[in-house]
Swiss-Prot record:
<feature type="short sequence motif" description="'HIGH' region">
    <location>
        <begin position="127"/>
        <end position="137"/>
    </location>
</feature>
<dbReference type="Pfam" id="PF03485">
    <property type="entry name" value="Arg_tRNA_synt_N"/>
</dbReference>
<dbReference type="InterPro" id="IPR036695">
    <property type="entry name" value="Arg-tRNA-synth_N_sf"/>
</dbReference>
<dbReference type="GO" id="GO:0005737">
    <property type="term" value="C:cytoplasm"/>
</dbReference>
<dbReference type="Pfam" id="PF00750">
    <property type="entry name" value="tRNA-synt_1d"/>
</dbReference>
<dbReference type="InterPro" id="IPR005148">
    <property type="entry name" value="Arg-tRNA-synth_N"/>
</dbReference>
<dbReference type="InterPro" id="IPR035684">
    <property type="entry name" value="ArgRS_core"/>
</dbReference>
<comment type="similarity">
    <text>Belongs to the class-I aminoacyl-tRNA synthetase family.</text>
</comment>
<keyword id="KW-0963">Cytoplasm</keyword>
<dbReference type="GO" id="GO:0006420">
    <property type="term" value="P:arginyl-tRNA aminoacylation"/>
</dbReference>
<comment type="subunit">
    <text>Monomer.</text>
</comment>
<keyword id="KW-0067">ATP-binding</keyword>
<dbReference type="GO" id="GO:0005524">
    <property type="term" value="F:ATP binding"/>
</dbReference>
<dbReference type="InterPro" id="IPR014729">
    <property type="entry name" value="Rossmann-like_a/b/a_fold"/>
</dbReference>
<dbReference type="InterPro" id="IPR008909">
    <property type="entry name" value="DALR_anticod-bd"/>
</dbReference>
<keyword id="KW-0547">Nucleotide-binding</keyword>
<keyword id="KW-0030">Aminoacyl-tRNA synthetase</keyword>
Length: 580
């Protein structure tokens, strides 16, 4: 195992030596000791706690007795036996040399955190073309991007991919409305957003005509459009080619704003015809069944229903394309694991897809994983592009930027350049959105509330960003003396020790979050670190501190917190404003 935590490793070595002195005939495993070290329930008990249970079992001695014997032999740290545990505390100088110094020189953030792992593809952000991108799409984008960043930070080999839906009924509806009913001229700009409005209007019209003779006509017209798209010919196909580019341009603008890039772009249109042909081949080989004119796989015996792959009219479905794409990912990109970041409403879909792949003999099916998450709602309920009750993303960003400029940055008018105001407003808005989308556990629903997410005094992105900006401002106002040796022993205030303990746990927090696909854990870590810094900032004077050595040590501690906040924000895909 990789032992990246220097304080934990030091404790491991000291414990191993102490165990050897207490029990000369017994040799303890370094890995077992390292893994048994935990954070005590209260920070004032110590930096780490070692449970003696496994050791006691091997020695056939009561755990409290082992704890007392080993603690008595500990050197290089303060060790206190507390029942079956040994609470271990290091002095400030050790913390400074082992943790703070490595944070300040940057080496702390370059340590590999995980053993060699399988080459993994993370597929996320699968927006549909011909629909408007809205705030509901952001949970997927933020979650997928954070997972990619966390895993890469930890040392994993990751391939990021996206799979936009540029085919299907939603596209046919939009094109149908444009050709047959739209009276508006196509705008010169923001064509992608305009397409989304066309899609919503199409749905409203179709719903109005349900139950009338026009309903069957509409259905036939939509089917004919889909056949044109699949056949790659006809006026609707030509219109699709043009309008598809408008949507892709909008996606790329959003990704540029979010600072998200993908190693691989897949499109449903690329999988459409080949996947349908493959399904027909599998049916001809007797590997699939027909039910009521549709081709698929009967999974009723496994309580997964009938996995439909070709409808009775010959058109494919999402599952059809996902089957073929899974093969492409493993065979063409040579990945060893495939993760799909898709909301929980698609749980049955992926269970069916993975099971069908397995039945078809695709061995890598066992290495496919659906990372599901709950969806985003507005305070008054769920969003729907079909109904048009959404908050368009670009409109939301502009509103949030205006709020930041009016509420927080207006005081700097005349002092800051317009360029700086715009830049920082954008960074804070982005931080609010990303943190708000990531701070909740993936199984919990998110209710989007712009005002709450933009608060500077709550659990929010702007609060963490503001803490970083405050530290940056402090460093500019009171720069540390270049080359001066820092006396870490000066950091003996309770709030200073709390910060040092927290800083040493950053890599451990990221490694655990990456392993469990839970960026919410990093949000919690950063929020707690920012809170601890603000306590320290108010309790321990810096600029007015008369003792030079103490001031230098506190400035170094502040800088270490700032670097950790900055790296933590980066792991979550969030910017760190230098001033706010």
């Amino acid at each position: 195992m990789i032992k990246h935590d220097s304080i934990r490793l030091l404790a491991t070595n000291l414990l191993k030596d102490a165990i050897g002195r207490a029990y000369p005939d017994f040799s303890a495993s370094e890995d077992d000791i390292y893994k048994a070290l935990v954070n005590p329930p209260k920070s004032d008990l110590g930096d780490l706690a070692f449970g003696c249970f496994i050791l006691a079992k091997a020695l056939k001695t009561a755990p409290p007795q082992v704890a007392t014997a080993v603690a008595a032999q500990m050197k290089g740290a303060t060790a206190v036996a507390a029942g079956p545990y040994i609470n271990i505390r290091f002095d400030e100088q050790t913390h400074g040399e082992q943790v703070l110094a490595t944070i300040l020189d940057g080496s702390y953030f370059k340590k590999p955190l995980m053993e060699k792992s399988p080459k993994t593809m993370i597929e996320y952000s699968q927006p549909n073309t011909h629909k408007e991108l809205h705030v509901g799409h952001m949970r997927n984008l933020c979650l997928g991007d954070a997972i990619v960043r966390m895993l890469r930070y930890s040392g994993r080999e990751i391939v990021s991919s996206t799979f936009p839906g540029d085919m299907g009924t939603h596209v046919a509806k939009c094109l149908w409305y444009m050709k047959k009913h739209n009276q508006e001229p196509v705008p010169e700009t923001e064509k992608g957003e305009w397409l989304g409005r066309m899609y919503s209007k199409a749905n409203l019209l179709l719903e109005d005509q349900n139950g009338t003779p026009q309903e069957d006509i509409n259905r036939q017209e939509l089917t004919a459009i889909l056949h044109q798209l699949e056949g790659k010919t006809g006026p609707y196909y030509d219109l699709w080619l043009e309008t598809r580019e408008w949507s892709i341009e909008l996606m790329k603008k959003v990704y540029a704003w979010a600072d998200v890039t993908f190693d691989e772009w897949y499109f449903e249109s690329e999988m459409d015809s080949p996947s349908a042909a493959w399904v027909k081949q599998l049916y001809a080989e007797g590997k699939l069944e027909m039910s009521q004119g549709a081709i698929g796989k009967d999974l009723e015996s496994e309580k997964l229903g009938f996995c439909m792959l070709l409808k009775s009219d010959g058109t494919g479905l999402y599952a059809t394309k996902d089957l073929l794409l899974a093969k492409h990912k493993f065979e063409d990109v040579k990945i060893e694991k495939s993760v799909y970041v898709v909301d929980m409403r698609q749980a049955l879909h992926f269970k069916q897809v993975f099971r069908v792949l397995e039945i078809l003999g695709f061995e890598q099916a066992k290495n496919c994983f659906h990372l599901q998450y709950n969806y985003v709602e507005l305070p008054d309920g769920a969003m729907s592009s079909r109904k048009g009750n959404i908050v368009p993303l670009r409109e939301l960003v502009h509103r949030m930027e205006d709020h930041v400029k009016t509420t927080y940055l207006s005081r700097y008018k005349g002092e800051w350049s317009e360029e700086d105001v715009e830049k920082i407003a954008g960074q804070v808005a982005k931080g609010a959105i990303f943190y708000g989308m990531l701070r909740m556990d993936t199984n919990k629903k998110i209710v989007f509330d712009m005002n709450e997410w933009l608060k500077l005094d709550g659990e929010s992105g702007p609060f963490v960003q503001y803490s970083y900006a405050r530290i940056s401002s402090l460093g500019r106002k009171f720069p540390r003396t270049a080359g001066a040796k820092i006396d870490w022993s000066r950091l003996n205030h309770a709030s200073e020790r709390q910060l040092m303990q927290s800083l040493g746990g950053f890599n451990t927090a990221v490694a655990a979050a990456a392993e469990n696909f839970k960026p919410s854990a990093i949000c919690t870590y950063l929020y707690d670190l920012a809170k601890s810094f603000n306590v320290f900032y108010h309790e321990c004077p810096i600029g007015t501190e008369a003792d030079v050595a103490t001031r230098e040590a506190r400035l170094a501690l502040s800088e270490a917190v700032g670097l950790t906040l900055k790296n933590g924000l980066a792991v979550l895909g969030m910017p760190a404003p230098e001033k706010m």
